[in-house]
Amino acid sequence: MKSGILPIRRALISVSEKSNLKDLASFLEGRGVEIVSTGGTASYLKKEGLKVKEVSDLTGFPEILNGRVKTLHPKVHAPILFDRDDPVSAKELKKMGSKAIDLIVVNLYPFETIFKSKAPRKDMIENIDIGGVALMRAAAKNFE
């Protein structure tokens, strides 16, 4: 973004390791940041008393395939990937009925830990993170 530091208005949080998450989310909420989150993370934050919008409310589509598909949706990735300096991109995002996602908080499934524990192959496969990697790549692509 050419105009300087981007104000953070909306954050997407999707984490498997939740250490210190309450503190971070409370900090963001205290500064007026809207928090959008995936199922397990949203449940955790709500239990901690924070206001959270679930990703499925954002997309209008539930998490599917036992949680394998949560954030792989245009209404999640477009607000991260759109070119903030391009009025056409901003207009297209608005036409979708969406708003920018300014901050991504992600950590990946603990594949290495599961692998080292010699867990069953099925457990290892379930701990290959797809959506988290896609979110990080989308955020990196639009970082300036």
Predicted regions and their residues:
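A generic local secondary-structure boundary/capping motif
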Residues: M1-K2, N66-K70, A90-M96, M124-N127, ...
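N-terminal glycine-/serine-/threonine-rich phosphate-binding loop
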Residues: M1-S37, T41-L58
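Internal alpha/beta core interface subdomains
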Residues: L6-R9, S98-E144
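Short, flexible loop segments at the rims of nucleotide/cofactor-binding pockets, characterized by
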Residues: A11-S14, I80-F82, M124-E126
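Helix N-cap/beta->alpha junction signal
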Residues: E17, T38-G39, R84-D86, G132
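Short glycine/serine/threonine-rich phosphate/pyrophosphate-binding segments
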Residues: N20-L21, V88, V133-A138
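Glycine-rich nucleotide/cofactor/substrate-binding loop typically near the N-terminus or early
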Residues: G40-F111
